[in-house]
From Swiss-Prot:
Regions recorded as binding DNA: 178-199, 225-248
Function, as annotated: Primary regulator of plasmid-encoded virulence genes. Activates the transcription of icsA (virG) and of virB, which is an activator of the ipaABCD virulence regulon.
Gene: virF
Keywords, in A-Z order: Activator, DNA-binding, Plasmid, Transcription, Transcription regulation, Virulence
Species assigned in the record: Shigella flexneri
Protein name: Virulence regulon transcriptional activator VirF
GO MF entry, a single one: DNA-binding transcription factor activity
Keyword Transcription regulation annotated: yes
Subunit structure: Homodimer.
Length: 262
């Protein structure tokens, strides 16, 4: 839901598929999940675990580049873990014993060295230098054990990740569960049951992929809503607008207008 009381403020629902490092360059953010709330102050760097669903309230102090993001895919996370493993010897478990937001989102105070390192990493191509620089930045987090556990959990490959990889190869296609079962050589019942164990459905995954791709198209291109709808495999623009609003809590037009100066 968008807060129209302040033109520089927006409330949005977010579900992340990649681990991200966020620099709140010219904005502050309030992140909430259930009864928990966490504030990312202007100038802070935040490490945010993937596969968490959060509500984010963003208040811009400037219309130009309010925040910057580095996205870490699974290969990068695994490389970072290989560096961290010999250094840390934590007795952690993956039991998901109700970890709170402060065990999934980690903050660094505004420090010139950390910000300079973030900016440097953002421009680096994939390689050893980038991996070691990321490990260096992550090592600045005070709760090292919780961070290591968070990264380890985020780097695991789930069954739903396999399905995402298949769908993302052709987002325009009108996917059915039978297409996935054929790709994976599994019965539809087996696919459903494995997704149920992750508390997901095929339709949820499909919606996640489409809405994430729609947001990227709105931000990174001059595509009209009708074009975006078609490019993500939804034939009806009005249906796309409704689903986007339900997913993000804001219409595609308002989403674009708020972010167009980013």
């Amino acid at each position: 839901m968008m807060d129209m009381g302040h033109k520089n403020k927006i409330d949005i629902k977010v579900r992340l598929h990649n681990y991200i490092i966020l620099y709140a360059k010219r904005c502050s953010m309030t992140v909430s999940s259930g009864n928990e709330t966490l504030t990312i102050d202007e100038g802070q760097i935040a490490f945010i675990e993937r596969n968490i669903q959060i509500n984010v309230s963003i208040k811009k102090s400037d219309s130009i580049n309010p925040f910057e993001i580095i996205s870490l895919d699974r290969n990068l996370l695994l490389s970072i873990i290989r560096i961290m493993e010999p250094i840390y010897s934590f007795q952690h478990s993956y039991s998901e014993e109700k970890r709170g937001l402060n065990k999934k989102i980690f903050l660094l105070s505004e420090e010139e060295v950390s910000i300079d390192l973030f900016k440097s990493i953002k421009e680096m191509p994939f390689g050893k230098r980038k991996i070691y620089s990321l490990a260096c930045l992550l090592s600045a987090v005070s709760d090292e054990e919780a961070l290591y556990t968070s990264i380890s959990i985020a780097s695991s490959l789930s069954f739903s990740d396999q399905i995402r990889k298949i769908v993302e190869k052709n987002i325009e296609k009108r996917w059915r569960l039978s297409d996935i079962s054929n790709n994976l050589n599994l019965s539809e019942i087996a696919v459903r049951k494995r997704l149920e164990s992750e508390k997901l459905t095929f339709q949820q995954i499909l919606l996640d992929i489409r809405m994430h791709h729609a947001a990227k198209l709105l931000l990174n291109s001059q595509s009209y809503i009708n074009d975006v709808s078609r490019l993500i495999g939804i034939s009806s623009p009005s249906y796309f607008i409704r689903k986007f609003n339900e997913y993000y809590g804001i219409t595609p037009k308002k989403f674009y207008l708020y972010h167009k100066k980013f």
